[in-house]
A protein has these predicted regions:
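NTP/phosphate- and nucleic-acid-binding module
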Residues: 1-76, 81-94, 102-104, 108-655
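Conserved P-loop NTP-binding catalytic core
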Residues: 97
Length: 655
């Protein structure tokens, strides 16, 4: 029948519809609930509006709000409502771009005379957005010629810039070369690739979060725009839960806790992204490093050390100056050894070239492989000031860097044992909810043949598949020198952090021309595996601080026990008990009774100490103490020897 079309559904079934039927019509034939919930459709792999006429034979799935694609669309459409509200309320304002992002959306604006948005402005904007939503304005898609688009957006220079580059800009261009727009009648139109919800009435569970400065196209030479961030969800309950998570995340912010708990700071005199660790933070970091060193020694790693700078030739050979120069600090030009022209030195951005030179320093035999090198190596990355963020994005960091040199035959076993080692060690620090991500060859920045990349990628895939964890594919996300598997860890409030990485590298061994002598007496190229377990000490410190909300487990806490006397005449015993605990290997202190006991206990709790011991007359007589555990019930008259045994067990078991 010529007037019918056949549509394939995700479950393999088929629907017959009248020719010209839309995705919305299809949803209605499946059921009234789906028709009500439908946001967009995926037609032959491409996202489309519900008004899209379906072609005969198409494979179609209907997208609902609770899915990732549905939420993405809701946030995208809400960004358009934000732009309309701002242009309504601020005459002379111009708008730039407004994409959906993880958990929300933003839109960039430029206000007349360099004005900025205020908190009161956000309230007004949000109120206007709710009016637009109540009007149920449709999202109407169109495609227009470039000259018409330029005339339509003549008062908005950033839109005109996008239009002029439409052929290369997926935010505006279509397959036909026309400029794609979406209109919300009667007064708003925007450049956009879409798709969008059917009308603004499908939105509403949103809030505007904050305003920040943002350079146009992320370029520091371009104008600074005003970026309004918001979040949008499919239900009121989901929005409320997200805002609660944000509140909890704010309480756990490592920058805030770092100051409150006297862990670290970023002095202006040193520079952006360069941290100093205070004694308490230094204690936590030392414990992290010491335990890691011990585990690496048990696993057969050999410890190496390398300098912080090198002549440029090393990074030319490694490819860093070709592929990573934007992330490196500028060179230091030195007249080395009296040479007239001098030599450029660079702060090292990575440790791997130095470890390769150690391998290459002498002839290697197959009997030495696998050779596992490990270093807590300081590296330096020139991060833009706009992306520097606490300890999670710094310019100077220490990586727990390992490089394994092995034969091709050993590679599979090494990757398997490496991944087991990584997951076990992260578990000892209290992270045990993981998934894995496999990052493949980047399209533009890559060295080596496609065949070599495929071989390395498959080796990583095989190792990851042996673990009982979800494996997510990150197409094109590999480093320029090889693919990687990264361990993604979820913290106590469900956020995901990229932790350890494992990379197979066929390229650097070739660039440095390293070899080993095989069983046949011939020279062979080793496989090189890069592995950073923490990523960097600084970033891992931040993750643990937020995971534990500053309340580090007893084995990591900078102070494990504080001893308090009930009265000032108990102070001598309190300090003597603290000294006994120190002698037993614990981190303990005591505080004089110069204020009421309740105030001293409260202050100790704000420092998030695992244990507070209180001693009075009976405790002095019986060698006992009142034990006040963090988050637990107070126990009175506990024998000090029993407490020592308990604390020792917690430390031994990493609790």
């Amino acid at each position: 029948m010529a007037d019918l079309i056949s549509i394939s559904l995700p479950d393999g079934s088929r629907k017959e519809l009248p020719a010209g039927a839309t995705a919305a019509d299809l949803a209605a034939t499946i059921g009234p609930r789906l028709a009500k919930d439908a946001v967009i459709a995926v037609v032959d792999g491409t996202e489309r509006d519900l008004t899209f006429p379906l072609p005969h034979g198409a494979e179609v799935s209907i997208v609902t709000p609770s899915t990732d694609r549905g939420l993405y669309t809701i946030r995208h459409s809400t960004a358009h409502v934000l732009a309309q509200a701002v242009l309504d309320l601020f005459p002379g304002a111009t708008f730039a771009i407004g994409p959906p992002i993880q958990d929300g959306f933003y839109y960039d604006f430029e206000l007349p005379a360099g004005a900025t948005f205020t908190p009161d402005d956000l309230e007004r904007i949000e109120a206007r957005m709710r009016e637009i939503i109540a009007e149920r304005q449709p999202f109407i898609r169109d495609e227009i010629p470039e000259d018409q688009a330029l005339e339509l957006f003549r008062e908005h220079r950033y839109k005109c810039e996008i239009i002029r580059g439409a052929a290369d800009d997926p935010m505006a261009a279509t397959e036909s070369g026309l400029v794609r727009t979406y209109e919300n009648p009667p007064n708003f139109i925007d450049l956009c690739r879409g798709p969008h919800v059917p009308h603004t009435g499908r939105l509403g569970h949103f809030t505007l979060m904050r305003v920040a400065g943002a350079y146009w196209r992320g370029d520091e030479t371009q104008p600074m725009l005003q970026r309004i961030y918001g979040t949008a969800w499919d239900t009121k309950e989901a929005l409320k839960a997200h805002l609660h998570r944000l509140e909890e995340a704010e309480k756990r912010d490592h920058r805030k806790l770092g100051a409150e708990l006297d862990l670290f700071s970023f002095p202006d005199e040193i520079g952006s992204g360069l941290a100093v660790f205070h004694p308490k933070g230094g204690t936590v970091r030392r414990l992290m490093e010491e335990y890691s060193r011990r585990r690496h020694e048990q696993a057969g790693y050999e410890f190496v050390y390398s300098p912080h700078i090198s002549k440029e030739g090393l990074f030319q050979t490694s490819g860093h100056l070709e592929w990573f120069a934007d992330g490196m600090f500028p060179p230091m030009h030195l007249h080395d050894h009296g040479g007239e022209e001098g030599i450029d030195y660079y702060l090292k951005p990575m440790n791997c070239p130095f470890h390769i030179l150690i391998f290459r320093d002498r002839t290697r035999s197959y009997r030495e492989l696998p050779l596992r090198m490990f270093e807590f190596g300081s590296v330096y990355r020139y991060e833009k000031s706009g992306v520097v963020h606490g300890l999670t994005r710094v310019r100077g960091m220490t990586q727990d860097d390992a490089h394994i040199f092995c034969t091709k035959e050993q590679m599979a076993d090494e990757l398997d044992s490496l991944l087991t080692f990584v997951l076990d060690l992260l578990g000892d620090y209290g992270l045990d909810d993981f998934y894995l991500e496999l990052s493949t060859r980047p399209e533009h920045k890559a060295v080596g043949s496609i065949e070599e990349w495929d071989e390395a990628t498959e080796a990583l895939r095989a190792a990851a598949s042996k673990k009982d964890l979800d494996l997510v594919l990150d197409e094109g996300g590999g480093a320029f020198y090889g693919p990687k598997v990264s361990v993604q860890a979820r913290d106590a409030i469900g956020r995901t952090w990229q932790m350890s990485t494992l990379q197979v590298d066929f390229q650097l061994p070739q660039r440095f021309d390293i070899h080993y002598t095989g069983t046949d007496g011939q020279r062979h190229r080793p496989i090189m595996i890069h592995r950073a377990l923490f990523g960097s000490i600084e970033r891992f410190f931040a993750v643990l601080t937020e995971h534990y909300a500053g309340a580090f487990p007893a084995w990591l806490a900078p102070v494990q026990v504080r001893v308090l006397g009930v009265r000032d005449d108990h102070d001598d015993h309190a300090f003597a008990l603290a000294a006994r605990l120190k002698a037993a290997g614990f981190r303990a202190d005591a505080v004089e009774a110069n204020e009421p006991l309740g105030g001293r206990i409260r202050r100790a709790k704000t420092e998030k100490l695992p244990y507070i011991l209180v001693v009075g007359d009976d405790d002095i007589a019986n060698d006992t103490a009142g034990v006040n555990p963090r988050g637990g019930e107070v126990e009175r008259g506990v024998a000090v020897a029993d407490f020592v045994e308990r604390l020792a067990a917690e430390v031994m078991e990493h609790r």
